[in-house]
Amino acid sequence: MPFITPDQLQKDYDVVIVGSGAGGGQMAYTLTMAGVKVLLLEAGRKFDPTSESPMFHLPSHAPLRGISTPDKQYGFHDCSIQSGWTIPGEPYTQANVEPSRQFRWWRQRMLGGRTNHWGRTALRNGPYDFKPYSRHGVGFDWPISYEDVAPYYDKVEMLVGVFGTNEGIENSPDSSPGVLLPAPKLRVGELYAQKHGKKVGVSVVPIHRAVLSARQDAETIPAKLHPGNPRAQRILAESMRSRAACFWATDCHRGCAIKAAYDSTSVHLTPALATGNLDILSLAMAREVTLNPQGKASGVTFIDKRTGQEGHVAGKAVVLAAGSQESVRLLLNSKSSRFPQGLANSSGKVGKYLTDSVSSSYGAHIPAYEGMPLHNEDGAGGPHAYVPWTLLAENKEMGLGFPGGYHLEF
């Protein structure tokens, strides 16, 4: 695998990508399969899920009884490395001293980014989500529609492997026939919710998750994704054959050494590296995007975290895929006489009005479960069922002051 050091950088690349998570991984995969020469900059270290995931370890294997460490904030039985709300050696400031008004986000410094600990719930945005102003009078409509994006949803779902069912529910789009893998059986609690949800008009249906419930069809999918490109088809087929189906036995948060659960390293970067068109420079913290005299992106300046030295890599194009906050940081850092407020920031709005998801959780004791025979229903290490977005218009109609709805996972 061509993991390189700064002194091994080529003079020029077709594309420089910052970030190796879902966006950066997919971009690297798509470009390299088409023959484009790509450099990927990753702020964290190299990570191999097949050899570093403690999915089969018993509690007795954990050092210090599994207590958290600077490297693993959630303890030994967690696949994350160098991740957390704060990262050692990366100080940052808050704009507000009141804790309730501070914005914090989870950062991941490892190859594959946050795909390593993402819950892998893989639902599509629906038609309403692309046109919030037309529907609710808030925000702005996207210049594209769900129909424009739908074919690409199909392609990504076939590539990464998503299980689920098509239910024909409002604003919860179905996949094309043959795209989804079979949904696993619902667990007892999910069946209980489904039974009683019907009484109050709430749909409880199989969720869509990026976990292989069955082996992928390596004979036909590569040709669908890469028509007319036999080399790309061969590389993808080999990658798909290296992934095993989930055997419903361990916690996905420990990582997935058998590649059943999606992560960028296993699904995107492995075949991208096999093309010979991808170099990966890890432990390289991007600092700013550099421009040519015409004002076009010409490369990225980075800090080598091994030595603290500054480096630069040239590229004909630059892709920022470092997550919303880190990509914003790079845009704002990239100031020049032509762009005094940073790149793509003539409005002065870059970095403002970021919105996080609002979520909560609850638990309950259900007497009906008492006395149930012991049985194994570990499943896919996360929900098998969910309540699709509901009450999409009722909130506003009932005078609650906001549009939107609610979504539940079990």
Where do the model's predicted regions map?
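Beta1/beta-strand and adjacent pyrophosphate-binding region of the FAD-binding site
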Residues: 7-23
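Residue-level detector of alpha-helix initiation sites
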Residues: 21-22, 26, 184, 325
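Gly/Ala-rich phosphate-binding loop of Rossmann-like dinucleotide-binding domains
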Residues: 28, 32
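Conserved N-terminal glycine-rich FAD pyrophosphate-binding loop of Rossmann-like flavoproteins
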Residues: 45-71, 108-117
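FAD cofactor-binding and catalytic pocket of flavoenzymes
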Residues: 88-107, 111-114, 142-146, 347-410
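A conserved short coil-to-beta-strand element within the FAD-binding core of flavoproteins
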Residues: 209-210, 282-298
